[in-house]
């Protein structure tokens, strides 16, 4: 089992549990160059809010899009957009990634901006 397959198995297990709860999810995906965050409806088929370092508005403020500062900017942006739509409570879906570094920075920034999880 390689590293990517193990991560996908962890993510699948966590998503199954969150689906049983029927919770709105804050999903994080990261690549070496970018980080993406989406708030997904409980049914799992609708993206309610999204933000990423690919967006010009966020990328222009940053020197580099693949670090913790960039992740914090995405976390703040996704939280502000979610609060505008009336979404306050979410479950954090880290997609099998360790809760460390950029994933943690995004989560902390989203909490500081007002999301609860």
Swiss-Prot record:
The UniProt record lists the keyword Isomerase: no
UniProt-listed InterPro entries: Ribosomal_uL18_bac-type, Ribosomal_uL18_bac/euk
GO BP annotations listed: translation
Any single Gene Ontology cellular-component annotation: cytosolic large ribosomal subunit
Membership in a protein family: Belongs to the universal ribosomal protein uL18 family.
Binding partners and assembly: Part of the 50S ribosomal subunit; part of the 5S rRNA/L5/L18/L25 subcomplex. Contacts the 5S and 23S rRNAs.
HAMAP family noted in UniProt: Ribosomal_uL18_B (MF_01337_B)
Record's protein name: Large ribosomal subunit protein uL18
């Amino acid at each position: 089992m390689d590293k990517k397959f193990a991560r996908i198995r962890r993510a699948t297990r966590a998503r199954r549990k969150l689906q049983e709860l029927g919770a709105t999810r804050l999903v994080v995906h990261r690549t070496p160059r970018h980080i993406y965050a989406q708030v997904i409806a409980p049914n799992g088929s609708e993206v309610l809010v999204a933000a990423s370092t690919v967006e010009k508005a966020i990328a222009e403020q940053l020197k580099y899009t693949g670090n913790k500062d960039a992740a914090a900017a995405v976390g703040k942006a996704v939280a502000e957009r979610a609060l505008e739509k009336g979404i306050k409570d979410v479950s954090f879906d880290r997609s099998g990634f360790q809760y460390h570094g950029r994933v943690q920075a995004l989560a902390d920034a989203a909490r500081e901006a007002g999301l609860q999880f």
